[in-house]
């Protein structure tokens, strides 16, 4: 899909490459994509090189952040291949409050889980500062 790498979650578009695509053609819905979605996807794919640096930065930042927090005792963080880190904490309410203090929003799930989207280096450093303070305060 184009959602993660190109920041186009709202257009709901993906593509497929392969040798046997013709066999799938009978399964396709006619006019499955709006002309707006097709135009956006076409423009983005024509400029794919411009997105490569952004993707490399996201991967690098994701790995940097994961390496720092993976050994924290108050968090369980999971390896990721996406543009976010997924974690759990039994003290999630406190963690969320600490993020709120710094005007940082993370995805909150009903159980002890949360998700942190990878941002710019500066944004990620702010997130790491909160995670460090959380770990230190609860150790």
Task: Please give the residue ranges for each predicted region.
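A short acidic, often aromatic-flanked loop/helix-cap motif at beta-alpha or helix-coil junctions
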Residues: 4-6, 86, 115
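PLP-dependent enzyme catalytic core of the Aspartate aminotransferase-like
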Residues: 97-102, 107, 111-139
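Short acidic/glycine-enriched loop/turn segments that link adjacent beta-strands
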Residues: 10, 81, 110-113
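Conserved PLP-binding catalytic core of the aspartate aminotransferase-like
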Residues: 59-63, 67-102, 118-120
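PLP-dependent aminotransferase class I/II
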Residues: 1-71, 76-77
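Asparagine-centered polar/low-complexity signal
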Residues: 32-34, 83, 124
